[in-house]
């Protein structure tokens, strides 16, 4: 299947006491989700590190650096894309990629997807309905081969 790096970030599983839906230090819920929609989860460093969150307003360079570390680690481990749950994570990792590529010449770019786009694709929604045209990093080619995300019993 499509090799996707799950990005839990700093908020999906925290605070643990209130949420308690997965092990915060070794989460599996996002990996399990990706497998259930036919993707191959990619393990990588920094998958639970903060992407820069709200400091993207006051310290954009710090958010650019944080997002670069996450994206580059995912890419170096073979990810074709990274999946997020948070709109701010999407902004920092997708919309900031022009700044990331400018600051880090070794980074060619990596598509960023919402987990809901992968779910919709797996459920048979046409790629033209996934909102991919809103992405700063083109992602539509990832959805050309339906077999990459087919759910197999």
Feature map (PLM): residue ranges:
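Iron-sulfur cluster-binding electron-transfer modules in prokaryotic oxidoreductases
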Residues: 1-153
